[in-house]
Amino acid sequence: MTELPDSYDPNSIEPKWQDEWQERDVYRFDPSESDTQYVIDTPPPYPSGNLHLGHALGWSYIDFVARYRRLKGDAVLFPQGWDCHGLPTEVKVEEVNDIHRTDVPSDEFREMCIDWTEDRIDEMKATMQELGFSQDWDSEYRTMDPEYWGKTQESFSEMADAGMVYRDEHPVNWCPRCETAIADAEVENIDREGTLHYVTFDGVDNGDIEIATTRPELLAACVGIVVSPDDDRYADRIGDTFEVPLFGQDVELLADDDVDADFGSGAVMVCTFGDKQDVEWWMDHDLDLRTVFTEDGHLNEAAGEFAGLAIDDAKTQVAEELDDQGYLNDTEPTEQSVGSCWRCDTAIEILSKEQWFVEVDQDRILDAAADAEWVPEHMHDRLVEWTEGMDWDWVISRQRVFATPIPAWECNECGHWEIAGREQAPVDPTEDDPAVEACPECGGDDWAGETDVMDTWMDSSITPLHLSGWPEGTTLDEFESVDLRPQGHDIIRTWAFYTLLRTGALTDEQPWDDVLVNGMVFGEDGNKMSKSRGNFVQPDEAIAEYSADAVRQALALGGRPGSDVQFQWKEVKSASRFLTKLWNITKFSTGHFDEDTPAIQDPAYRDADRWLLSELSTVCEDVDEAMSEYRFDRALRSLREFAWEDLADDYVELVKGRLYNGRPGERAAAEHTLYTAVTAVTRLLAPFSPHTTEEIWQSLPGTEGSVHAATFPSVEYRDADAELAGKRIAEVAREIRAWKSDQGMPLNADLDRVELYFDDSDDDAARLDTYDLSETVNAPIRLIDGRPDVELVPVDVDGDDSEIGPEFRSDAGTVMEAIAAADPAAIQAQIHSGDTVTVEADGESFDLDADWLTVTEEYRASSGEEVTVIEASFGTVIIYE
């Protein structure tokens, strides 16, 4: 037990405990320490180096759960991973070093990515530790380490053996900036204004036709024209042939139900490919494939004189040439939604490429998702909507460098692909040979290692398997779902979707029991945080201004899980004030504790004690229920209300007399009650404010080890009668203290007596234990049934000289004297009977507006004594000074 410092100083407390926890391995996962384990599938973030408030919200939720589950007796695995691979890192390294990845050898570029990533991880870890997150750093993993990406390769091989991975040519989303295929989930639609071009196609042995397109640069790739079968304008022209302007190929007019006859001219050219709709028409009508775009976003030789132009430049020049040759009839602006690369915002193209794919089994994904508990429930709908909308398999190959190598080799003689066995992982096919010497198809021995790498979601989608100990400690058949997947709603269509897909495909099990979804953090102005808007706040800025514990509370109170949270400085300030209040209450309380306090036997509790313990029992149950339902806002609000109002403002004030002047037994009861409440509140608050509660815990007698290794408080002392009695005692004490303050009286000023009148004569609470109340208000207390016999008597009249002066001028003084000398009761009677009051002075009458007069009233008891009357929830309080 250590002495609590006089003042709350988070700047010294928080770093001290962060170091202490790490040195003592307080959060190390040891499954042998408990019969129950709780495993959290923590998000492995992209290590940008910038741990923003959105991260802080998500990881605060995770930490609340982890600390709560430890208090409940579980051995908790709270790991931390880092999703290192992929486009974000490569793009950043290219930007920082002002290079393109092809400017340096692949191995050198990969090392640059690793070095940059390691530095960013260190930065993010430092902020995580400043916020007091309780990861088991012995369970840290990085997807760029061979120990991890070897598992990704093993899972790839398992799925390939099961026929769920294949290589084929198929249209794919392609980013010209990043020069790689990307999955549907990595395409983000951006709304912008485009231009609709009305272009004439000359007929071949038939009349002309006008089509409408926003992409004239794709004319070289045009392989057909489609119209609605219900469009009367073209009903008799289906099958006609037309020549594509500038490029000369012939195309046929086709009917298709997906055409919107009201858009443009109603005739649409089919190109390979402008968008996914083009792909569907191309496949449905078995059209030719004409590729005109290069991987880096230029037109190829098939575009003739426009070859070599960037796509945007080609759009402009082709439109100009159409106009010059008389094919362009008109243009008009149009709103369009353009698919763009999630990382660089470049408009994606659709190219037909030979790639690696993973089969998407929608039914299995939906079944596994339905078996999980989604918090909030409507987030499950997002997953369902995305899954049901999937129309392509998952393209997993990427034409990049910094990612998990695809473990496969191509036979240069027959084209057979040999996939590595699980036992070969981790393997780099660009450096290592396949396990077989001869090709099983043709017997050849000339192999080329696959240079494509995997989508980074192939890494992070096996996190539940990694946490289960696969493949070293468990088999896929033995896999059991982990307890919790916490994540943001923005990656439901990626991380959640791909994990459901991969875990289901590999184990036929759901990956997790619960999915806890957090929203985004917005600025104080309600807008998305942005430096340009001036509403951007970094976690370390808020920590420096107040404390990590205060920031965590503010995030908890921001709203229920799944909802977006508006960051508000006032909430952080309020949390800081609460922590200071709790500190001061604890400091006061520990002054009355000693080593024997926890062991006090059979305390002689009074009503105030029983009331607080009963309220505490309710709070413990409420917090437990709220935490189990992930309602951190509700749990913290309930706890703060009890600690601030019931414990600090009411109970402590009620029992100060007993603590200082009470008999030993009475004093011991108050001490034990206070000890029970403070130790319980400390543990209940520990998930939210770990540093402050740890410091407080160490100052309390009878405690051992860390508060974060303690047990969740269970205070079984429910007493409805005591709760009612205590609430009334506290209410009266609170009202009298407020009245004394308003009167400018010292709070310890003696009063003649206080009478409590109870409206309900059968109210058992009329027999209150008034000892603590009497000590608190410094007055004898009488309990009386019924209503008090008091009367409100007018005792003084005051005139408004700002009205009377101008009205009566030289007589104003005489009128004011007459008002002062008048009978207040008579004046009040005139006010009640009309709008005018008459006063007399020196034999003269003066008429005044009733609004110019104020009558002061006082309560008088039947004895004639002046009293103060306070209406209470149970009846009336009468104060005799």
From Swiss-Prot:
It is found in: Cytoplasm. InterPro entries: aa-tRNA-synth_I_CS, aa-tRNA-synth_Ia, Anticodon_Ia_Val, M/V/L/I-tRNA-synth_anticd-bd, Rossmann-like_a/b/a_fold, tRNAsynth_Ia_anticodon-bd, Val/Leu/Ile-tRNA-synth_edit, Valine-tRNA_ligase_type_2. ValRS has two distinct active sites: one for aminoacylation and one for editing. The misactivated threonine is translocated from the active site to the editing site. ATP binds at residue 531. It catalyses: tRNA(Val) + L-valine + ATP = L-valyl-tRNA(Val) + AMP + diphosphate. A motif ('HIGH' region) lies at residues 45-55. Catalyzes the attachment of valine to tRNA(Val). As ValRS can inadvertently accommodate and process structurally similar amino acids such as threonine, to avoid such errors, it has a 'posttransfer' editing activity that hydrolyzes mischarged Thr-tRNA(Val) in a tRNA-dependent manner. SUPFAM superfamilies: Anticodon-binding domain of a subclass of class I aminoacyl-tRNA synthetases, Nucleotidylyl transferase, ValRS/IleRS/LeuRS editing domain. The keyword NADP does not apply. Belongs to the class-I aminoacyl-tRNA synthetase family. ValS type 2 subfamily. It holds the Pfam family tRNA-synt_1. HAMAP family: Val_tRNA_synth_type2 (MF_02005). It is an enzyme of class 6 (ligase). It comes from the Archaea. GO terms for biological process: valyl-tRNA aminoacylation. GO terms for cellular component: cytosol. Its EC number is 6.1.1.9. Keywords: Aminoacyl-tRNA synthetase, ATP-binding, Cytoplasm, Ligase, Nucleotide-binding, Protein biosynthesis. GO terms for molecular function: aminoacyl-tRNA deacylase activity; ATP binding; valine-tRNA ligase activity. This is Valine--tRNA ligase. A motif ('KMSKS' region) lies at residues 528-532. It comes from Halobacterium salinarum (strain ATCC 700922 / JCM 11081 / NRC-1).
